[in-house]
């Protein structure tokens, strides 16, 4: 359990920021369900394209939480650039913290809730 302390801390940080008005951007509906299952209660937006997503979020504090794979990294990079045109610097560190020491077990946001349940012993 101690090995996963950074994972749990990152999840707690995500929940706290979400409760305080930060918008979480994910890749799909399964990602939304996974985050809701672990208690993320704030607004979650599904990525629809760089320009449209950035325009929707231009006046918000944003957390980009895409998968830790090539496609997710590509979306993250493009969305960071699109948000910069509005003078916004999104949070990508929570994603790094979540996936940093669990890459062997999970790489997708939709897998977070099942993994959380497995290692915490808490039924979601």
Swiss-Prot record:
Membrane-crossing residues?
none
**Cofactor (UniProt):** Mg(2+)
Name the positions where Mg(2+) 1 binds: 27, 67
* Keyword presence, Nucleotide-binding: no
Q: Which domain of life is it from?
A: Archaea
Query: Residues in domain Toprim?
Result: 21-98
Which keywords does the record carry? Answer: Magnesium, Metal-binding
This entry's comment on the bound cofactor is:
Binds two Mg(2+) per subunit.
Which residues are involved in binding Mg(2+) 2? 67, 69
Query: Has keyword Glycosyltransferase?
Result: no
Query: From the Swiss-Prot or TrEMBL record, what is one GO molecular function term?
Result: metal ion binding
Q: Which family does it belong to?
A: Belongs to the UPF0292 family.
Specify the protein name: UPF0292 protein AF_0905
Show the taxonomic lineage.
Archaea, Methanobacteriati, Methanobacteriota, Archaeoglobi, Archaeoglobales
């Amino acid at each position: 359990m101690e090995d996963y302390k950074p994972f749990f801390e990152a999840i707690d940080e995500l929940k706290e920021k979400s409760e305080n008005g930060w918008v979480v951007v994910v890749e799909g509906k399964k990602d939304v369900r996974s985050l809701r299952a672990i208690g993320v209660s704030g607004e979650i937006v599904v990525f629809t394209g760089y320009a449209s997503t950035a325009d929707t979020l231009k006046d918000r504090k944003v957390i980009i939480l895409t998968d830790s794979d090539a496609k997710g990294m590509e979306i993250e990079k493009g969305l960071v650039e699109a948000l910069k045109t509005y003078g916004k610097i999104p949070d990508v560190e929570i994603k790094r913290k979540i996936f940093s020491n669990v890459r062997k077990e999970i790489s997708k946001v939709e897998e977070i809730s099942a993994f959380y349940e497995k290692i915490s012993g808490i039924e979601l």
